[in-house]
Amino acid sequence: FSTLVRYGVLAAFQALWAGPYLMEVMGYSTLATGNLILLLNFGMILGAPCLGTLSDRLFRTRKGVVIAGLTGILLIIIILTLIPPGIHLAVLALLFFCFGFFNAAGLLMYPHIKEMMPLEMAGVAMTGINFFNMIGPAVFLQGLGSLMQALYPDASRGPEAFNAAFKMCSVCLVTATTLYFFTREKRLDR
């Protein structure tokens, strides 16, 4: 469930909703919007090796780093519901970079789940994660759009609609993070 939510929120935000949110609600140009979304991707690119190193060498836990990443994503979504239009671009740049960085923790779900399974079941485990990774965007892209349209039919791309979508993402992330606390973990003895 956690991989469905994490990647669903990321894909819905990055691929569809970040652009209209930044241009129509926050009032930024297409160039600034594109650069902010690019920063999100840079955050993910840099986050993957950093969080992998933290997981493998420093903390020796995948579960803990994933939970920290999910919590970071949640905090950023909550901040996005609170910031006013016209906030300084540097604040959004930091938030978008961190959103990508913390989302990179989701990549640790793959080895976390794989290490819990017997070797002969590793392929099935990876198939399960990939399945839920792909279902997440399908659910969140359509679901958030439908929610925004249903709650605000005349202003489905207005500030209130985006806040409702962000709040729904927050509820899902709280649930996913809470459930992830209950996953088992094989100790990393490296």
Annotated model-derived regions:
Residues 1-49, 110, 137-145:
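Extracytoplasmic gate region of multi-pass secondary transporters
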Residues 48-60, 148:
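Helix-to-loop junctions at the C-terminal end of transmembrane segments
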Residues 57-70:
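Cytoplasmic membrane-interface "Motif A"-like loop-to-helix N-cap segments
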Residues 62, 146-171:
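A membrane-interface helix-boundary motif in multi-pass transporters
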Residues 71-85:
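C-terminal ends and interior cores of transmembrane alpha-helices
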Residues 81-84, 166-190:
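Multi-pass alpha-helical transporter architecture, strongest
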Residues 89-106:
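Hydrophobic core of transmembrane alpha-helices in multi-pass small-molecule transporters
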Residues 118-153:
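A late C-terminal transmembrane helix in Major Facilitator Superfamily
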